[in-house]
Amino acid sequence: MDKVRIYLLPGGKMPERKTKGAIGFDVAIRTVVSSMEMDPTNPILRKTLFDFIEIPKDNPYIERHVVIVPRQAGDQLAYQMDPGESVLVGIGFITEMEWPMFYWVAPRSGLAAKWGITITNAPGTVDPDYRGEAGVLVYNRNPHPFLLHKDMRIAQVIFQEAIIPNLVVVESYEELSNTARGTDGFGSTGIK
């Protein structure tokens, strides 16, 4: 069996297959992170915008999205996504995989079907030489707000091995073999 070395970040959760027959490992939200800025104190991480522990005081945009959710175990903070909003979340771990293994970050079908929540960078490819925390760009396609919670299972990762072909340049289009399909593209095979 192939091994993947995994470093859990503080507050991160181990990816988990929820059934014996599952191919994908569910991954959970650790933090809301910046898509542009790295953490000034830890260059392997993106800048944390919201950690689900404290209401941020230095970012009015993020602060207006934070809501308090009453729970039996005590109030919890959540991030309220606006309709049509995308938010980048960190999933709490860093991997080391042998080349040519990689993983794809894919949506969880239940979130999409039941809640209208999907991910826009799907599948997001995480290469074996990447040594940062993978991010999931969550998209709310609903006409109403949606709450993101810490440790919410937000996506799944699917480990695979890549085929790395030798690319051979030909001098003309005629050197490529003909097919019955030819240049028929989008929708050419119909929907039935």
Residue ranges and their predicted role:
Residues 1-192:
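DUTPase catalytic domain/fold
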